[in-house]
Amino acid sequence: RDDVESRGLGDVYKRQDNVISNMNFWERILYLLQEYGTSYLKGAGTTLVIALVSTAIGCLIGFIVGIIQTIPEDKQRDSLLKKIVLKIVKIILKIYVEVFRGTPMIVQAVFIYYGAAQIFNIQMGMWQSAFLIVSINTGAYMAESVRGGIISVDPGQTEGAKAIGMTHVQTMTNVILPQAFRNILPQIGNNLIINIKDTSV
């Protein structure tokens, strides 16, 4: 049966090749649109959904990681335990950023999709895997963008906020992050474009 089906499909492909070979360029384009136009539109829609959702999730991850990386260490007020925990968390986040920025997305996709099933016995669907992989990858890139955006804000503004009694969280939300967000907007657009192209992986 398989041989019959394969021969049948082979005959269909041969007939299509013969038909297409006798067409000029524009006729071929029109023929492909008529035959596969619905598939192209479906694929484009899937690409946009994955890229938009994953970029949004990746930005959220990037903001969280970037903010944690820029938390200052208060040597006088912070307890020893808090210093140790913060240092360990920063090291883990730095490893995450370096690994996901330094390896190709195809390698990450293979490791997460197949590795999760083999190591943790977790079976993920294609959509779940796509969102997870692109989001985590985007988060690593956005983390550095957020960190750079926060650092680029004049340190005098942080000192001024602390001088009037603002906590670190208040300083970030009211003074630093609004300016940092404006600085990293172009990078968010760049990551969206990259994700649109990288969904082919």
Stretches found by the model and what they are:
Residues 1-13:
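Single conserved hydrophobic/aromatic residue that forms the stacking wall/gate
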